[in-house]
């Protein structure tokens, strides 16, 4: 299965289907982008979008989402889990989401106002994608990975800094309403690269591998702080930046 919907189509399918997105959904990022897109388009663009959806059989006579697409919109707006990987490189960027769908996962690429969904895929495919994105980021780029579910929100930004692999991590516990911040500059070894990959995919928690001394944390944090400008460029949240500053100063 593979199909593409633009953001306006997704907006209208959500509205006519009566769906509201939760705090796990990719719509937390897509909805603001959609509103920004609408502001630069003709005022009748939504009615034109409705006509296109009806003509293509995506909606019925009452503009309700047809059954096949309705299941996708429901999964998109109210997933139980969501994994996002955003890779920024000098020659471009990619923004990919994974959500559960029909007993497996959907891989969705968000680009230029369109969402291309493909699947079903296994979670192993998602992990392999993140590992490949990490390899690219540690060559010449910045990778931001976010995992969201009903209990927590886990965010990580990784890049290749001058003195090591700069790692910014935050874990927000929804029940306790508390956020914990992790920051470290890893030595540039293959073992550390594998360890970081496992933290990104959730196979490991935020922990240091053997060979990375916790007593070096303060020095490590100071080295990572030099890359704070990079973190800002990839929209790492202000709370993380403040927490990092407090931890180092």
What is the predicted function of each stretch?
Residues 1-51, 68:
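Short, amphipathic alpha-helical interface elements at domain boundaries
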Residues 7, 23, 63-241, 245:
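Non-catalytic recognition/regulatory regions in large multidomain proteins
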Residues 51-62:
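A short, conserved structural fragment
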């Amino acid at each position: 299965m593979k199909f593409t919907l633009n953001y306006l189509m997704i907006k209208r399918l959500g509205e006519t289907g009566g769906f509201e997105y939760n705090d796990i959904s990719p719509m937390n990022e897509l909805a603001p982008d959609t509103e920004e897109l609408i502001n630069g388009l003709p005022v009748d663009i939504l009615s034109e979008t409705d006509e296109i959806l009806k003509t293509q059989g995506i909606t019925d006579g009452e503009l309700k989402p047809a059954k096949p697409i309705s299941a996708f919109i429901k999964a998109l707006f109210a997933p139980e889990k969501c994994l996002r990987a955003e890779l920024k490189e000098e020659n471009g960027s990619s923004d990919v989401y994974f959500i559960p769908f029909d007993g497996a996962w959907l891989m969705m690429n968000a680009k230029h106002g369109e969402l291309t969904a493909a699947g079903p895929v296994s979670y192993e495919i998602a992990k392999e994608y993140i590992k490949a994105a990490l390899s690219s980021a540690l060559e010449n780029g910045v990778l931001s990975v976010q995992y969201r579910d009903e209990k927590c929100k886990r965010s990580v930004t990784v890049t290749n800094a001058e003195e090591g692999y700069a790692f910014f991590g935050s874990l927000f516990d929804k029940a306790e309403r508390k956020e914990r911040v992790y920051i470290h500059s890893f030595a540039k070894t293959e073992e550390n690269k594998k360890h970081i990959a496992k933290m990104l995919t959730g196979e490991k928690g935020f922990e240091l591998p053997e060979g990375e001394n916790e007593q070096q944390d303060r020095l490590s944090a100071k080295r990572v702080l030099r890359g704070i400008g990079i973190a800002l460029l990839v929209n790492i949240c202000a709370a993380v930046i403040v927490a990092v500053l407090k931890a180092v100063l």
